[in-house]
């Protein structure tokens, strides 16, 4: 898997914005990716040093629209903690209030 295939998109919520003060950044990642692959992908794409990676797997929730039943997509979320001497991720810098 390529680095750009592993990181799908950033998570921009109030909670993830509060974590940025602790140098933690949140991403939705490929479900098959492990912590080592996520760490390498973030370091390659953003040019930062990663200290730790926390991952969470979310199952899809059952949803219904009239008589049609389905599920929301399952996904994996990763919180990436940067080392104290590493620079921040530029994409998130403009979002901080």
Curated annotation (Swiss-Prot):
Protein's recorded name: Large ribosomal subunit protein uL23
Q: Which GO terms describe its cellular component?
A: ribonucleoprotein complex; ribosome
What SUPFAM superfamilies does UniProt report for this protein, alphabetically? Answer: Ribosomal proteins S24e, L23 and L15e
Record's keyword terms, sorted: Ribonucleoprotein, Ribosomal protein, RNA-binding, rRNA-binding
Q: Does the keyword RNA-binding apply?
A: yes
User: Corresponding gene?
Assistant: rplW
A Pfam family reported for this protein in Swiss-Prot or TrEMBL: Ribosomal_L23
Q: Which InterPro entries match?
A: Nucleotide-bd_a/b_plait_sf, Ribosomal_uL23-like, Ribosomal_uL23/eL15/eS24_sf, Ribosomal_uL23_CS
What are this entry's molecular-function GO terms? rRNA binding; structural constituent of ribosome
Q: How does it assemble?
A: Part of the 50S ribosomal subunit. Contacts protein L29, and trigger factor when it is bound to the ribosome.
* Annotated organism of origin: Thermoanaerobacter pseudethanolicus (strain ATCC 33223 / 39E)
- Keyword rRNA-binding included in the entry's annotation: yes
The alphabetized list of GO BP terms reads: translation
Q: What does this protein do?
A: One of the early assembly proteins it binds 23S rRNA. One of the proteins that surrounds the polypeptide exit tunnel on the outside of the ribosome. Forms the main docking site for trigger factor binding to the ribosome.
What family does this chain come from, according to its entry? Belongs to the universal ribosomal protein uL23 family.
């Amino acid at each position: 898997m390529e680095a750009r295939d592993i990181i799908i998109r950033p998570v921009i919520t109030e909670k993830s914005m509060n974590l940025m003060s602790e140098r933690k950044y949140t991403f939705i990642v490929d479900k098959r990716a492990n912590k080592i692959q996520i760490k390498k992908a973030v370091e390659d794409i953003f040019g930062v040093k990663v200290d730790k990676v926390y991952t969470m797997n979310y199952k899809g929730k059952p949803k219904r629209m009239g008589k049609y039943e389905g599920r929301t997509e399952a996904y994996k979320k990763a919180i990436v903690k940067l080392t104290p001497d590493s620079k921040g991720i530029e994409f998130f810098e403009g979002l901080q209030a």
